Amino acid sequence: MDARQMKIKAAEAALEHVENGMRLGIGTGSTAEEFVRVLAEKVASGFQISGVPTSERTARLCLELGVPLKSLDELPELDLTIDGADEVDGKLRLIKGGGGALLREKIVASASARMIVIADETKVVDVLGAFKLPIEVNPFGQLATRLAIEKVASRLGLTGDIVVRASGDGPFMTDGGHLILDASFGRIPDADALAVELNAIPGVVEHGLFIEMASMAIIAGPEGARTLKAS
């Protein structure tokens, strides 16, 4: 079973948790896109949901495949969000934002009664941090913001490069018009403390640490999908 097949298995298992008539947050990224595809097949058979996308990219795919969408302003309270993750640990703490949609992903997840994470087994880690931590920042004063992040990281014993994410000949811009700094910390032993510190930096719009947000994770491997709950 290759990586894409594992993502499809996770998406199919997550679909079993979606009930007819649900208000559904729909994530961003390669695994979330496989979920959109299996969801679209069910919608085509008469299944009804109202989806709220976490990015313009997800919205385009949903519209292309016939998944009905609403804005979060139209549906400010959601029953469930299904989204991927770049890393997930045993406490269901996540690193997200590899696809650049972390702000909207976190807003939508926070508006949901439950969040189910779907991922392949390569995303499960003992300690977060091998994947670069995305930090969304306002373009204004981004160098000052980066220095503030470096000072916070140093206080917590974290080291590594923090660089502006690029796209083509310029910086990557989020749907909200912000920059993303990718922090290569390697290991983040105290993700909770780092999340609190990053939240206190004025130029930080959002960060990719999702703490106490996921209610369960569906992890796919060669033998099929399994459920992971917080330890």
Curated annotation (Swiss-Prot):
Pathway the protein takes part in: Carbohydrate degradation; pentose phosphate pathway; D-ribose 5-phosphate from D-ribulose 5-phosphate (non-oxidative stage): step 1/1
Gene3D superfamilies, per the entry: 3.30.70.260, 3.40.50.1360
InterPro entries named in the record: NagB/RpiA_transferase-like, Ribose-5P_isomerase, Ribose5P_isomerase_typA_subgr, Ribose5P_isomerase_type_A
UniProt-listed Enzyme Commission number(s): 5.3.1.6
Catalytic activity: aldehydo-D-ribose 5-phosphate = D-ribulose 5-phosphate
A GO biological-process term: pentose-phosphate shunt, non-oxidative branch
GO molecular function list: ribose-5-phosphate isomerase activity
Top-rank EC class of the record's enzyme: isomerase
Family: Belongs to the ribose 5-phosphate isomerase family.
Subunit-structure text: Homodimer.
Protein task: Catalyzes the reversible conversion of ribose-5-phosphate to ribulose 5-phosphate.
Name listed for the protein in its UniProt record: Ribose-5-phosphate isomerase A
Provenance organism: Sinorhizobium medicae (strain WSM419) (Ensifer medicae)
